Regions:
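Alpha-helical substrate-recognition element adjacent to the catalytic core
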Residues: 1-125, 203
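C-terminal cap/substrate-recognition subdomain and adjoining C-terminal extension
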Residues: 74-217
Length: 217
């Protein structure tokens, strides 16, 4: 890659973070719901289920959870090793770092603010009277939406497609990785690895810097 300005777009669940946010939320419903949601998540990330349909089914299981439960679950989200180094080093070199997720703004907004991400996009949980309805508010952020976000942000900031980098682990990241100048599969499922230009199998997100020639700070 060149020394020109880059756009790095990260998946969130199991990439920027070590956890699947919806699985953390499901634990506040019941052990049975947590197992069911976790199983559906695993199949969706392996590309064996349609993401939008699987997300709709999983979110339905969250109906009745309070927004306070969402805040509590968010407190348990763990950043991936090397996440802060990746973001801060890339930005120090003049690049942009964004995140796009099939997860939820309610959980990702605090992380994006803490990391100082340049842009982020995710689904929104519908709530009424402080309780989740079990529905998504607005269009679903799926594989196509992730690819669109990468292209849209690059165009907005006059960054050539060849200077875009996408990092993800699951089946719904494949289109985004394929559209990027460099697609990086991070601790990824087989379907994602097959679509990637670079594969990182060590749980350290800062290794992305080495692959794109950006020094650590």
């Amino acid at each position: 890659m060149t020394a020109e300005r880059k756009l790095i777009v990260l998946d969130v669940d199991s990439t920027l973070t070590q956890d699947e946010g919806i699985d953390l939320l499901a634990r506040y419903v019941s052990d049975e719901a947590a197992r069911e949601v976790s199983n559906i998540t695993a199949l969706a990330m392996a590309g064996k289920l349609d993401f939008a349909a699987s997300l709709t089914a999983r979110v339905q299981a969250l109906a009745g959870l309070s927004l306070d439960d969402v805040v509590s679950a968010t407190a348990h989200v763990r950043l991936s090793v090397g996440a802060e180094t990746l973001v801060h080093s890339a930005q120090a070199a003049g690049h942009l770092v964004a995140a796009v997720s099939g997860g939820f703004h309610e959980m990702i907004d605090p992380l994006a603010a803490a990391l100082g991400l340049d842009m982020h996009r995710a689904n929104r949980l519908e709530a009424r009277d402080g309780l989740l309805t079990g529905k998504i508010n607005g269009p679903i952020i799926d594989a196509q939406a992730k690819r669109t976000s990468l292209r849209e942000w690059a165009a907005q900031h006059d960054i050539a497609p060849a200077n875009t980098v996408a990092v993800g682990d699951g089946g719904n990241d494949v289109l985004m990785l394929s559209a990027a100048g460099v697609g990086i599969a991070y601790m990824a499922k087989e379907i994602t690895r097959a679509a990637a230009d670079v594969i990182i199998d060590t749980p350290d997100l800062s290794l992305v810097l080495d692959e794109i020639g950006v020094p650590r700070v």
